[in-house]
Amino acid sequence: MASLSFASSHASLFCCQQSSSAIILRPAGALLRLSRRQPSSHTISTTDQLFPRRSRMPRNVDTHAAAERNSPSTMSSLEAVDELETNGDSAVVVVREQQQQQHLLMGATDDGLPPSPYDTAWVAMVPAPGNPLVPRFPQCVDWILQNQRSDGSWGPDGGSGDHPSSPLGKDALMSTLACVLALKTWDAGEEHVRKGLSFVGNNSPSCVMTGDERDAPVGFSVIFPGMLARAIDMGLDIPMMTQANVDAFIRLRDTELNRMAATTGSKAFMSYVAEGLGDVLDWDEAAMVYQRQNGSFFNSPATTAAAAIHGNNDRALRYLDSLVNMFGSSVPTVYPRSTYSRLHMVDTLQKMGLSRSFVSEINEMLDMTYRSWLANDDEEMMLDMSTCAMAFRLLRMHGYDVSSDGLAQFSSESSFRDSVHGQANDTEALLELYKASQIQITEDELVLVDIRSWSAKLLKEQLGSDKVSRSVDAQEVQQVLKFPFYTTLDRLEHRRHIEQFKAGGFHMLKSAYRFCKEDEELVSLAVQGFHSSQALYQQELQFLTRWAKEARLHDLEFARIMPMNTFFPNAALMYAPELSEARILCTKNCMLATAVDDLFDVGGSREEMENLVRLIDMWDEHEEVGFCSERVEILFRAIYDTSKELAAKAMAVQNRSVINHVAELWADLVRAMMTEAEWSMRGHVPSSMEEYMQVAETSFALGPIVLMPLYLIGPELPEAVVRCPEYKQLFHHMNVCGRLLNDLQSYEREAKQGKINSVLLVAPRHGGSIEAAKSEVRRAIEASRRELLRMLVAEADATVPRPFRQEFWNMCKMVHLFYMEDDCYSSPKELVHAANMVVFDPLRVREL
């Protein structure tokens, strides 16, 4: 019966290739005093089967709060690692201070929204009260005059209007025509109008035939033809524009309107793009349904300005007044957006591995969001799918008590199809809803079940038809669908997001906008932190390799002693520099637990098994027992010495001795393995799942791998907490997930070996059906995973502090990833590649 273990491999040279589209970034040597070299170019390769008999993993942790390292090193061989760790963390602090001086979090406010020429033009067209011959906002007219490009276009920052097939080409066309209409409305900027019309005329005819519809502003097919008709009515002569061209645009609009008329969500979308419809829309009716408390229509300045022009809407005017007062002479394409901006920033910091450096800022942002969630007073959050789903996910995962009822309005597929998001084929909204739906903590959260079902279906449809929105990377959609959040290793996720980070990546509404202020700062900070961590990991791996050799573990010919494969998952989840000692101990215990498992499973005689059990039972009095073989002596002394080392280090953190608990965990493990060995020798089959799991949970070996390192991560872990029911339940549900996931993967092999397995044990109650038995086992896994997640995020009345609960959840994530039934990490090549990406391979980051 398998326990959790990693197989490792030996190093060989690897040459990193530089592609034309990527730059290989290496760590700055100045960050590290002891290691000024770049991350090693050595990679891990193997001719061995990484999981020769069983797949199991060492424990891993992601502690969001900075865990204190109070224990001094007690081994001289670790001093260099300790110093490297301190210097690496100091570098992060220095960089963080520099970024704070540059207001890195400015992008998380509405002040960080860039100007939208398109929306500014519509605001500029609003007439003054009582005098329709002058503009209400002359400063917006001035801004238009001052911000025309040399080619005659207007458009979002970073865009190019040279050709309509460029990513922001249609945006430039729509923005330019809107600015021309605004200037013509007030007979201003004759030369600007001429140049703008020239740009539109030279580029718009090919617009119908070229470019990807995903690059078009939302509503382009309705709004641009509508503005074109208005320009003609105003007597504007557009160069190169023939009647055939005009007819083509009218057909484009008619086709879009006919498409919308066939859907139940057409009213919302037609109101959103109403500036392209003019007097055709019933503005009073639209105001009754879609005007928000702040006076806006959909938080869109352009739509709201059109309502003020066509409907004499006082609330719309007050919204526009406040908007111009806030932003000055230009306006953004959406306002307010502060809630989304804050949540987007928190999410980005987490995905890039930077959240530890901004704990107080993140807490402040989430506290603000939670207050709004409870008060239900934030229209931006409650009405916008992306914002609402992201708020739910981040709040729940950070321990805030939020109900899935907040997403009930999005429970059906029609809620998406009938919305502006659905009409715009908004991938981001779908993706956020899908990610939120995975954070299910009770079986009866059917809202999340329903959302997960239809959002996954639509995301797959978008991938299959190549309709993923430009604001979302298609690879991100594929990754999220393939790997649920409970199967991810944090450092691999950080690397992926850093490398795929879209500097200048834009969100497309009626005009493109982006959170531009944080791009370079975020990537720079993330790259430096990742590379300094890699240098530390390499030092730790070198130490562990030396330790295994000095402990003579390689003399155990039956054992899988593979430092790299046992270390890398710990680095991937327990990635923080200050957790160095916990990473090292966890890796040691995983190697030792693997060796113990191999002794009981394939390598040891009955005498050796019983001898090891007796030695661990006697512990400090082991000399009275003696060693029946050199192999048992090597293994016991490694366990004993490592445990004493842990106890000495833990004393400085816990202010008490933990050696009795440590010895107890090892004793429980070998007794359980001895029981399984006796079952196998006697051909005994447990009479029930309860009898089987009572032994099998313990024999999976997560006690030494997970529980012991908890003493090193801080804060204090009192004896009363270790013995409390909550702690035992956390351990139980983690063990259930690990053991049963392993059983699903190994039942065929163990059936041939005559060993018992939960799948084989359950099958008889289903008439011998293996598939039915597997379904029952999967349901048990799902129930334990759900309960473990509930215990992680439930802060009320929690006895076990969050950093320790996080450890149990991280191990649950690890076993889910490595025991996925589609064998995503079952091949040596894939596992080696993942290990290299965490420990050795430098980042390949897109140029900013």
UniProtKB/Swiss-Prot annotation:
It holds the Pfam family Terpene_synth. Mg(2+) 1 binds at D597, D601. It comes from Zea mays. It comes from the Eukaryota. It is found in: Plastid, Chloroplast. The keyword Plastid applies. Residues 1-64 form a transit peptide. A motif (DDXXD motif) lies at residues 597-601. GO terms for cellular component: chloroplast. Mg(2+) 2 binds at D597, D601. The keyword Plastid applies. Mg(2+) 3 binds at N742, S746, E750. The Asp-Asp-Xaa-Xaa-Asp/Glu (DDXXD/E) motif is important for the catalytic activity, presumably through binding to Mg(2+). InterPro entries: Isoprenoid_synthase_dom_sf (IPR008949), Terpene_cyclase_plant_C1 (IPR044814), Terpene_synth_N (IPR001906), Terpene_synth_N_sf (IPR036965), Terpene_synthase-like (IPR050148), Terpene_synthase_metal-bd (IPR005630), Terpenoid_cyclase/PrenylTrfase (IPR008930). This is Dolabradiene synthase KSL4, chloroplastic. One of its GO terms (biological process) is diterpenoid biosynthetic process. Its cofactor is Mg(2+). It is an enzyme of class 4 (lyase). One of its GO terms (molecular function) is magnesium ion binding. Its EC number is 4.2.3.196.
